[in-house]
Design a protein with these regions (language model features):
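A carboxyl-terminal module marker
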Residues: 680, 684-705, 744, 748-750
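Short secondary-structure junctions
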Residues: 524-527, 682-690, 735-740
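Accessory, non-ATPase domains that flank or precede helicase/AAA+ motor cores in DNA-metabolism machines
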Residues: 1-374, 381, 386-402, 685, ...
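Short basic, glycine-rich beta-strand/loop surfaces that mediate nucleic-acid
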Residues: 704-716
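Inter-lobe coupling/hinge segments of SF2-like helicase ATPases
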Residues: 210-216, 220-223, 232-672, 680-681, ...
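A general secondary-structure junction signal
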Residues: 48-50, 99, 198-200, 447-449, ...
Length: 751
């Protein structure tokens, strides 16, 4: 009976059916090479095998199977299907992020489509020949070699001393013998003294005896609470103030799972955090720790995926959001550190998934548990914990002898009126910086805007430099002497004359991290100043160098964007300055207050890791703003109550589920007709739950105009039914000849 296979390709298309050649064995989850179109060859994943011939005259056949074993387990396939359904994309789009790029080769001819590049690496291993396990014959070999071939004698002695039957990589032997080369080993093999063989490179997993950190009574209580709650609930929140020692609790739970032979996934929001965390975890768990992030080479990510796919358990992966797609077959625990961080949400391309939410579903599919950790949890997670859907454990005391920082709120308007403001710094902050530097301590300054200035302006006529492709001003980067669009990357030189009125008075306005760095170097000429933002960090090496210098106290003042807020632990920092809290609060987003609170508390936490406390200065023109007061008091509960009351009144998450639809096209008139038509269609289905059409703050990017619609559905309603209805309307819209070329981006649970 002829067989057919539904194949998922890395395209925004549904699965396609191919014939299975006679004699070829394929099964669900396997990778195969197929021809799609006239000449294009792709890697695909077998989704199901059946005997139903599709209604086509010609059915193309699978070219070949690319791996022996399936790349996806049944659980992974169910997870991919959930991601595709929930985030309204295709399994092929999930495949784009779910597999490393070397595992998805494509080419215009079958000859270009080679497996060689993604075969696992092998190493050459050597061992004593079986005959030399007899002591007499081994002694005879030593006597022959000691005078005639001393280097061969030393190599054989080294191998024999490694233990009976021990296999050693040739590279390790060469390192131990310093000047020994492969010729020595080849000579020993020709004489029959050793044997060699190639085998796949593996990672030594080590034992289960870990040197775990001691826990305080508060941490022990939290650990016991989590153990009990995991017996009843699939997920729990560990709510611990900054510096309370959440990581130590993670470590004990991780050790328990690894000791049982289970797999653990520890998610962090930023690549920047992985290096410090991996180093810390390796001190405890050794070679069991496997990093996974985009800064690793394609080859390394592929090797990691293939090794994990063969593993039978006991794996510990530390990685960023894409790590949720790794093949951890015995997954028992997923830890999501800083669960509130918006970096867990993928913006583009599809699937626009939130790794935190996916982790909860993923662990449930595997029968495992999810631990969400944060000092300032997202309000969605906070409500889930408060309602009993998730478990909840709290850490309200700081770990060790650390004291919370003292927070000062400095009014920028009052300081300016009193003549107590110099450049972009109030006198209060400058005085405290001088005192801290005088004591040999370090300072961190946070400004949530990179570049030298947000824009340049003509003082005479008000002209500003704007991007020709996007509806935004160009940011001035003094270091490169150019204007840059942070949306499309367009660059332009700074004009000498105003293009509008020809006056030579074009000046930068506002301030970014570059300008802060320059002004601080002028105000504190003896201080060593460094900057940490996307412009200064051009590579992982550059990032590590900046962090290492600050950690070693080779830098006195570190200026940076959000990158400096993410979980770093610098013992020398006694003062943190938040230079402009206003631009955190004044965003047109219902999450602005929550995000501002979270970010300022994170920044403040960098000064709260000392036995003598620390100090934080918040500069703002609105010292009486409720969020500023809540940050100064460390009042998360107060912030949560106030924001939840507003969300409930205006029907926003967690009391509603949002889906943002963004339409894009170069013809603004066509776009307006399209958005009006789609809004009418959706209102016919959802009524007043549809908001818009809306014009986003940046309504043109890369030459395309943008318009939006927001769908709000009650959190208690069936989200699956809402997606089904929405999908049907979007399909009908895309099939309309007038609007078929309009791009519709679907963003479920936008952040």
């Amino acid at each position: 009976m002829p067989l057919y296979a539904d194949i998922v390709l890395p395209l925004a298309q549904p699965a396609y059916t191919f014939a299975v050649p006679e004699g070829m064995h394929v099964e669900a989850g396997q990778a195969v090479a197929v021809q799609f179109g006239a000449r294009k060859f792709y890697t695909g994943i077998v989704w199901r095998v059946h005997d139903r011939r599709p209604p086509f005259k010609t059915v193309k056949s699978i070219q070949r199977v690319l791996y022996g074993a399936p790349l996806l387990s049944a659980q992974q396939m169910a997870f991919w299907e959930w991601v595709a359904a929930y985030y309204m994309c295709t399994p092929g789009e999930v495949m784009r992020v779910g597999l490393p790029s070397l595992m998805k080769p494509s080419g215009d001819t079958e000859e270009e489509f080679t497996e060689e590049e993604f075969r696992p690496r092998t190493e050459c291993y050597v061992a004593l020949a079986p005959g030399l396990h007899d002591e007499g014959r081994l002694h005879e070999a030593f006597e022959k070699l000691e005078r005639r071939a001393p280097r061969q004698y030393e190599a054989l002695l080294e191998l024999a001393s490694a233990g009976d039957g021990e296999r050693i990589p040739t590279g390790e032997v060469a390192r131990r013998l310093l000047r020994a080369d492969y010729a020595v080993l080849h000579a020993l093999e020709r004489k029959g003294y050793i044997v060699s063989a190639e085998r796949e490179r593996t990672v030594e997993r080590g034992g289960s005896a870990f040197r775990l950190p001691e826990l305080t009574p508060a941490q022990l209580a939290a650990l016991e609470s989590l153990r009990g709650q995991f017996a009843r609930k699939p997920a729990a929140l560990l709510h611990g103030i900054t510096g309370s020692g959440k990581t130590e609790v993670y470590i004990h739970l991780i050790a328990e799972v690894l000791a049982r032979g289970g797999d653990v996934l520890l998610l962090v929001p930023e690549i920047a955090l992985t290096a410090q965390l991996i180093e810390r975890m390796e001190r405890i768990f050794g070679s069991r720790v496997t990093p996974y992030h985009s800064k690793l080479t394609n080859r390394r990510r592929t090797e990691t995926y293939l090794r994990l796919n063969r593993s039978q358990g006991g794996e510990f992966v530390v990685g960023v959001r894409s790590s949720i797609f790794l093949p951890l077959k015995r997954l028992q625990l997923v830890v999501v550190d800083e669960e509130h961080d918006a970096s867990y949400k993928q913006a583009d391309p599809a699937p626009r998934y939130n790794a935190r939410d996916c982790a909860v579903v993923m662990a449930r599919l595997w029968g495992g548990r999810t631990l969400l950790g944060s000092a300032t949890p997202s309000l969605e997670t906070w409500v889930n914990a408060g309602s009993g859907k998730y478990g909840l454990a709290s850490l309200t005391e700081r770990y060790g002898d650390a004291w919370p920082p003292e927070i000062f709120v400095s009014d920028t308007i009052r300081a300016a009126k009193r003549g107590e403001r110099h450049a972009h710094f109030n006198k209060l902050l400058l005085d405290k910086m001088e005192a801290a530097l005088g004591r040999g301590e370090q300072v961190m300054l946070f400004q949530n805007r990179r570049g030298f200035a947000p824009y340049v302006e003509c003082s005479e006529c008000g002209w500003t430099a704007r991007c020709p492709h996007c509806n935004v001003t160009l940011t001035y980067h003094k270091g490169g002497g150019k204007l840059v669009c942070h949306y499309c990357g367009y660059t332009a030189p700074v004009p000498v004359k105003c293009p509008s009125c020809k006056v030579t008075d074009v000046v930068p306005r506002g301030f970014g991290t570059e300008k802060v760095e320059e002004e601080i170097a002028r105000l504190f000429p003896a201080a060593r100043v460094a900057r940490l933002d996307r412009d200064s960090v051009t590579s992982e090496r550059a990032f590590n160098a900046i962090i290492a210098d600050f950690e070693a106290r080779k830098t006195d003042i570190l200026v940076g964007t959000q990158m400096i807020t993410k979980g770093f632990d610098f013992g020398g920092v006694s003062l943190v300055g938040i230079l402009n809290a206003d631009n955190l609060l004044n965003n047109p987003d219902f999450r602005a207050a929550e995000r501002a609170f979270q970010l300022m508390m994170q920044v403040a936490g960098r000064a709260g890791r000392r036995s003598d406390g620390g100090e934080v200065v918040i500069q703002t023109s609105e010292p009486g703003h409720p969020v500023i007061r809540q940050v100064a008091a460390g009042d998360y509960d107060g912030m949560a109550r106030a924001q939840l009351a507003e969300r409930e009144a205006f029907f926003y998450p967690p009391y509603a589920r949002l889906t943002l639809l963004t339409l894009r096209h170069r013809d603004v008139a066509l776009l307006r007709r399209g958005i009006t038509e789609l809004a009418a269609r959706l209102r016919g289905r959802f009524g007043r739950r549809v908001l818009g059409p809306m014009t986003p703050p940046v309504d043109r990017i890369r030459g395309e105009y943008l318009a939006g619609l927001l769908l709000k559905v009650e959190s208690g309603a069936s989200s699956a039914r809402a997606r089904e209805l929405l999908g049907a309307e979007l399909k009908a819209f895309s099939e309309d000849p007038e609007f078929r070329n309009i791009t519709v981006v679907v963003n479920v649970d936008p952040q």
